[in-house]
Amino acid sequence: MDLRRLTCFLAVAEELNFSRAAQRLHMSQPPLSQQIRLLEQEMGAQLFERSRRAVSLTPAGALLQDKARQIVALHQQAGELCRMAASGLAGRLRIAFTASVPLFAQFSRMLGEFRQRYPQVELDLQHMTTGEQIAALTAGQIDVGFMRPSPAFRIPLPIREQTLWRDELMLALPAAHEQAAAGTPLALRALAEQPFVLHPAVLGGGLHEHILALCSEAGFVPRIAQPARETATMLALVAAGLGVSVVPSVYERICPPGAVFRPLADAARHSRIALVCRQDESAPCVQMFWQQVCAVRD
């Protein structure tokens, strides 16, 4: 269906006068009449009743008028969305984040501000570990990631990174633990014989590897009595007395009753959250998101 013919049809249908419709469209009347005849042939129905005194819509013309308005409006909307997408104002942004990232107040604030500024950009949020994010970025399955790389992890060169926030790892102990009331930072080696509640080994590079490296520096391999994929679950199991754990300090705000946090004395306890994307990323909405996040990260 020719969009120009529909535009001509709508002008005549609204003016009910071929001369005024032609003026409105900045064209002469004969080409306009020809466009209407071609549209009637295409539709297989007469669209206008014509007389010397008046022009009126036939039942078929009245039905087409409503549909034609929708088609023309959709075409205009599609064009506008395409232009917005080309400039980064519309599209889909796939964002991955590790479990602790939503606990940082800045995360929800920056998402809200981006959504308010660019309402036509759809945010597709996914929970992934650090290693899963690297794999997904490389495969083109996500656009941006918020990850927690271990100090020893080297982010691959095709990946661009920017440190956003820093915190440190802390001990999570049952409230009844003998060290729970300690007033000074605890050395991890003091808990070498304790059962641990930790994340299972998944794609590497993140929190699990950092904790194992801490334990190795302290001279032991942790005995994992209970694996738990979610840190909130780990804390609940610690509160139940199933073991001790090492978790980011940001989780202290959701520490359940029965568990306590104690600072670590180990020097390698420091951790960070990094923003990552592909080095060659050219999508405007990704670049705009990156710039906004880095501008409001504090």
Where are these regions (language model features)?
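N-terminal winged-helix
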Residues: 29-30, 80, 86-118, 122-135, ...
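N-terminal short secondary-structure element
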Residues: 1-35, 64
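A short LG(V/I)-centered, amphipathic sequence patch enriched
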Residues: 40-59
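Hydrophobic/proline-rich hinge and linker segments of small-molecule sensing/allosteric domains
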Residues: 160-201, 270-280, 294
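Short beta-strand-centered segments that line the small-molecule binding cleft or hinge
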Residues: 85, 109-113, 130-174, 182, ...
